[in-house]
Every structure is written in C-alpha cells, then in structure tokens.
Swiss-Prot record:
Keyword annotations from UniProtKB, A to Z: Bacterial flagellum
Biological processes, Gene Ontology terms: bacterial-type flagellum organization; bacterial-type flagellum-dependent swarming motility
NCBIfam families: flgE_epsilon, FlgEFG_subfam
Subcellular location: Bacterial flagellum basal body
InterPro entries: Falgellar_hook_FlgE_sf, Flag_bb_rod_N, Flagellar_FlgE/F/G, Flagellin_hook_IN_motif, Flg_bb/hook_C_dom, FlgE/F/G-like, FlgE_D2, FlgE_epsilon
SUPFAM superfamilies the record matches: Flagellar hook protein flgE
Official protein name in the record: Flagellar hook protein FlgE
UniProt family annotation: Belongs to the flagella basal body rod proteins family.
Short name of one Pfam family: Flg_bb_rod
PANTHER family: FLAGELLAR BASAL-BODY ROD PROTEIN FLGG, FLAGELLAR PROTEIN
One Gene Ontology term, aspect cellular component: bacterial-type flagellum basal body
Gene3D superfamilies linked: 3.30.70.2120, Flagellar hook protein FlgE (2.60.98.20)
Length: 718
C-alpha cells in the first residue's frame, strides 16, 4: 500500500516541477530572445517480484516479469532553441539572429565569454557596444590606423575577421581623414557621326610659323600667351556641325588676284596655234591680213574655249590681253595663265613657259609630313602657313620663297572664332597692289569637289583686300567636342574642379586637355599656362571601342601644401572593350564619371548589415566598416547553462563554441534594427498547464485513495 502512496507523491512532485517550468515559460512570453523549456518525465525504478522466463522444452510457455513501478520523476529540463519571430524596432543597435548562433558577450571585458540570443544592444559613454545588463559585445574591430583611405572602396566595407576577438568599441568622435584622388574613371561616348551635336571653334593660331616638334600637334604660346594647337583639317566641321570629311587630295583653289598676260598679236596668213593651260587653240586668219583682224580672230579663238581654260581674252588697243579670274571650280586647266606650248603664227609672241600664277591649289593629305612645295596640308597650321606664304609671294614677287615672317606684309591667322583671317596689314608699301581673293573648289577626274570645305573658305572672297584696310575671314571652323568636370581631392581634403575637354582630331582620333584651377599645376603644362595639360590622345577601333590612350595618368600639384605630385590614373576603359570611352555614331554624352578621393569627415551615424558589420556613415558621404559582431554556434545548443539575464554559458555537454562571422559555418544572418521575440507559444503553454493540472489532480487522487484503503485496514483491527 505504501508504494501506491509514494507513487502518487512522486507524481505530484514531478507535475509541480512541470508546472514551475511552464509558468516560467509563460512569464517570459515577452522576453527578448527567450527560449522556452519543457520537463522530461521518466518513470522511477520498478520493484521486481518475478523475472521474465523463456518457454521450456517440455512445453511450458514463457512468463513475463512481475514488477511494480515506484512512480515518476523529472530527469531534465530541455531548452527548445527554435526561431522566434523577428520584430522591427527603431533602434539601430538592436540586432536579431535569423538562424543558428549566439552573440558573444563578456561580463569582465573579454576574460570570460557568455552567450545570448538577446540583441538589445546600445553604446555606453565610452563607445562600447554593451547589453542592457552592461556586458560588452565582442567581435572584430577595424585597426585604429586603418581609416579606409588606402585600399579600395570594397576593402573599406570589410573588417578583418580572422584575428582574435575584441571588445567592440567605437570612438564617438571618430574622424575619417581625407583621401587624395588617385583614379578617375569615366564612361562616355564621343560622337563619331557626320553631324556633331557639340562643337567648339578650332584653336586660335597666330601668324608666326612654328615647327612641330613631334610632327603631330605642337603646343606653343602665341603673342597673347594662349596655348595653340594645330588640328587635323580632315576631322573638322563647319559652323553648322557638318563634318568636312576631307579625303586624300581634296582641297580648294585660292586666287589672290586675277592672272593676266598681255601680248602683241602678229599679222599672219598662216594657221595660228597656241596651247594655254594644256588646251590647244588654233584659228585660220582672215584673208585680209590686217593686225586688227588677227587680234579679233585670236580673241575669238581663245574665248571659244574659256570653259576649258578659264581664260578670257580682251582687246587692249593693238594688244591682246588675257585674264583668268580663277573663279571656276576644277583642276589646273582652269586656273592661272600658263603657256604650255609655244604659239605659232599670230601667237608667235607666246613663248613656252610664259605664265602668270596667282591661284594656288591646296590639297589635303593624311600624311603627317605634307609637302608644302606642292600645296599639301594636313593641319590648320599647315593651311594657314600656305595661304600666308603664297599671298605674300603674289603681292611682292621680290620676296624669296623662304622669306622670314617678319618680312611679310600679309598675315594669316585663325582667330578666336575659328575663322581663317587674312589681313593686308602693311599700309606703307603703297607701290604694292592690293589683293583680290577668290576661293573655288578643286576637282579632277579622280578627286571630287568637297563643297562643304569650299563653302566654308569662300568667306575669304573679297573685291579688294586693301593695304591697312579691313581683313577677310572664312566661315567658322569647328571641331567635335565634349567636356565634363569632376572634383578631385588632394591630401589635405581640398576640392579642385578638374575639367576634361575632348575634341576630335581625326577619323578615329580624339585629343583631350585637362584644366585645373590656378594656382594648381599639371606636369606637362606650358610655362604660360601650367594649369592646362594639352596633348592627350585617344584612338578608337573601327567598332567604336577604345584602342588606346596616352597618357594613362596625370601628375597634379595643388600648390597649397598638399602632397605633390599627386598621381591620378585615368581609367577611361580597357583596350578593345566598351567599358569606358567609346566613339560611335551617337550623341556625345557622359554616362558616369567618378574619382576615389574624399574630404575628411566626422562620424554621423551607424548601422549593421546582414553580416553583422557595423557601418559608419561620415559627413563626407563615405561609409566605413568599423567593426563586426561575432557569432558562436555549438554542437548542442540545449546543453548550454542558463545564467539568467538572457545569458548562457558553455558546458561540457554543449561543446566548444565555434566562433565566426554571420552567414558562415551554419551561422545565421544578422538583421539590424530588429529583435528576436520569445519563442513561447501561449496557446501551447496554456494547454500544457491544463494537462499538468490534470496530471497533478490524478496523482493526488492516488494519494487519497491509498489513504482511504489504509484507513480501512486500520479499521479491520478494531
């Protein structure tokens, strides 16, 4: 009888423990990161009366044992580490673990390690990240000397998590020092089409000849100390933005005055012949052999082929006057007056080699060494020099072919508006006649007339270029251009507005210049303009991808005490790719331009990412990884010892803590501005209370029943 009594008592005690556990679960229904527990019931040792026996060979069956249980007990409380709900908060230092893992905290600044799922953290007055109970959160902290201004932007968002754990502490007055720009990257298109959407006047050139040092585009100072650059005429545009597209040998004629020749005509009864400008002219004299009839006949014969020679004949007293105004488009046969074969008969006074050359052909060539002796040009400087040279020779035939510029009375420049300008500046030399300029197109059987080029130069046409009078100017010549700007930072954190200007210099060639504000200087700048770097080169492939560029970097001296020279790499794209600059038939446009420098900044705000990295936002717009919260996981989470205050400690049955970063090694992710709620399910807990209550009541009934039977036994004695 006593066994039943004590079994009931044991049952009541076990259910009392279960009631305590479930009540504790319910009490912590709103405790952050709390994990509920349950009681594990086991039966007590049984009292064996008979053991079980096996069947006998004589046929007697086997028998089960005869044993009586001695009640129930609780051998363990099991913690259930299922995921709690994640709740949003307004606190940036609140953290929640989604998945396995525990935050690592220390009550003694790192000597002892405890663990928690409660991520309700805050910064104390010294900048330490702590729990509400004052335990310091551990992880990895960025080296104090590593301010992120040496590595890449990606490195700035990472913390070295391979070292030993530290207490997470962030200086609330942290300052990020300035980082000098050492790289400019750019994505843009430079228009390769026939029509330029963005143009600018070609660079001004003075009337002083300069010899290119590199055979391409020299940079030199004019009298006004403005940097000058000679440009490829084949890459230029007219003032409407239409590309000239000069092909090899295309060009113009420039006549500086009408060609003239006066000759006596001999009376003759014979046939007369003459070859002018390569065209044969012949006539048979009238039967009357007077000089007058010979003049008229000669004039009529020459004028009959004017469309082939450009020459018109006039009667001037008893002489024949030939004149070519050089106004017709065409080849050499229509220009000047040249006796290409001596005359006979009435033309006997026309000798082989007689000529009056006042019109000059200027033809474009792609060669970097054009032959000036035959009127070839490539750059604006080549054409300017040719026009100036020939204009002075025509005006003053006494000048030597290699005369000095100082001896010239006619100056040709390209003005600030991109126009070729001719000025008959000498008003003292009155014995020299004025010029009469006319521009016409050049064409031949193999070369077409470039009308755009001719029309742009026809602005030079003038009735008379008077000494000391007004100048004559062509239309405006432009180059395709594109410009963009970006602020670069020096080592002191000072901004400098750097402007990059691109201009087309050839079919697939672009040049660029870089300008920084004074007193800053660029290595390679001229003495007059040290803040301007000229001569950058870009070459594109026939698919519009970048083929190459030079130079690949700039050297900048801010002239304000900052480190110098500051080397800035120009990351304009990879060769053969479309990841930077391109040149296709599309408007010129900058899609993106970036540099990697920044000014000094104060720490303004913090936040955590999913890896537990503490990111600091600074007043300079930069973000820097300041620290990373560590996580620990265990082979057996249920083996951890609860210490109260939402804190656990490691035990022999939990296994060693496996420490690492979030999202690695079975460790979960971390959510900022969130907390993990208790995983207690009230409906389950309240149901369990009813079950425990019924169990307790049933066991109490066993006690009262046993008591009643004992009373019955006592009554039997009476």
């Amino acid at each position: 009888m006593l066994r039943s009594l004590w079994s009931g008592v044991n049952g009541m005690q076990a259910h009392q423990i279960a009631l305590d556990i479930e009540s504790n679960n319910i009490a912590n229904v709103n405790t952050t990161g709390f994990k509920y527990s349950r009681a594990s019931f086991v039966d007590m040792l049984s009292q064996v009366k008979l053991i079980a026996t096996a069947p006998y060979k004589n046929g007697l069956a086997g028998q089960n044992d005869f044993s009586v249980g001695l009640g129930v007990g609780v051998d363990a409380t099991t913690k259930i580490f299922s995921q709690g709900n994640i709740q949003n908060t307004d606190v940036k230092t609140d953290l929640a673990i989604q998945g396995d893992g525990f935050f690592i905290i220390s009550p003694d600044r790192g000597i002892t390690r405890n663990f928690t799922r409660d991520g309700e953290f805050l910064f104390d007055s010294q900048g330490s990240l702590v729990t509400t109970g004052g335990l310091v959160v551990q992880g990895w902290v960025r080296n104090g000397s590593d301010t992120g201004n040496k590595g890449s932007d990606t490195d700035a968002l990472k913390v070295d998590n391979t070292g030993p754990l530290e207490n997470i502490r962030i200086d609330p007055g942290m300052v990020m020092p300035a980082r000098a720009s050492n790289r400019i990257s750019m994505r843009a298109n430079l228009n390769a089409g026939r029509h330029a959407d963005q143009t600018a006047a070609v660079f001004a050139l003075d009337s002083s000849a300069k010899t290119p040092s590199d055979g391409i585009n020299p940079v030199y100072d004019s009298g006004t100390n403005l940097a000058q650059v000679a440009e490829d005429m084949g890459s230029l545009y007219n003032e409407d933005g239409d590309a000239l597209l000069l092909n090899e040998n295309q060009g113009i004629w420039v006549s500086y005055k009408s060609a003239k020749m006066v000759k006596d005509i001999l009376p003759s009864a014979e046939n007369s012949t003459l070859e002018l400008n390569g065209v044969k002219i012949s006539f048979t004299n009238d039967s009357a052999v007077s000089r007058t009839s010979s003049l008229v006949a000669a004039k009529n014969a020459i004028n009959a082929v004017k469309s082939q020679t450009g020459i018109e004949a006039y009667l001037d007293g008893k002489q024949l006057r030939l004149e070519n105004t050089n106004e017709l488009d065409g080849d050499e046969k229509l220009k000047n007056i040249v006796v290409t074969q001596a005359g006979t008969g009435a033309f006997a006074n026309f000798l082989d080699g007689d000529k009056d050359v006042t019109a000059f052909k200027y033809s474009y060539t792609h060669s970097i060494s054009p032959n000036a002796d035959i009127g070839q040009f490539r750059t604006t400087e080549d054409l300017r020099a040719l026009i100036q040279h020939d204009a002075n020779i025509v005006k003053d035939p006494s000048l030597a072919d290699n005369y000095q510029d100082s001896a010239a009375s006619i100056g040709v420049t390209i003005n600030q508006y991109g126009m070729f300008e001719i000025n008959n500046k000498d008003n003292k030399n009155v014995i020299k006649e004025n010029l009469n300029i006319f521009v016409s197109g050049y064409s031949s059987d193999s070369v077409t007339n470039n009308v755009l080029f001719k029309n742009a130069m026809k602005g030079l046409n003038t009735a008379s270029l008077i000494e000391g009078g007004a100048s004559a100017s062509s239309s405006k010549f432009t180059h395709a251009t594109h410009a963009t700007s970006i602020d670069v930072i020096d080592s002191l954190g000072t901004k400098h507005a750097m402007r990059i200007e691109f201009y087309r210099s050839g079919g697939a060639e672009w040049n660029f210049r870089v300008i920084v504000p004074e007193p800053g200087e660029l290595v390679g700048g001229s003495a007059a303009r040290p803040n301007v770097f000229e001569g950058g080169r870009l070459h594109f492939n026939n698919d519009g991808s970048l083929a190459g560029m030079n130079p690949p970097l700039l050297q900048f001296d801010p002239k304000n005490g900052a480190d110098a020279p500051q080397r800035i790499n120009l990351a304009f794209g990879s060769s053969g790719s479309f990841d930077g600059l391109t040149s296709v038939d599309k408007i010129s446009e900058t899609y993106a331009i970036e540099q990697n420098g920044y000014q000094a900044g104060d720490l303004m705000d913090v936040r955590f990412d999913s890896d537990g990295v503490l990111l600091g936002a600074f007043s300079n717009g930069r973000t820097l990884a300041l620290a990373q919260v560590a996580l620990a996981n265990f082979a057996n989470d249920a083996g951890l010892q609860a210490l109260g205050g939402n804190v656990f400690s490691q035990t022999g049955n939990s296994g060693q803590a496996l420490i690492g970063a979030a999202n690695t090694g079975r460790r979960g992710s971390i959510s900022g501005s969130k907390l993990e709620s208790s995983n207690v399910d009230l409906s389950r807990s309240l149901t369990n209370l009813i079950v425990v209550q019924r169990g307790f009541q049933a066991n109490s009934k066993a006690v009262t029943t046993s008591d009643q039977i004992l009373n019955t036994l006592l009554n039997l004695k009476q």
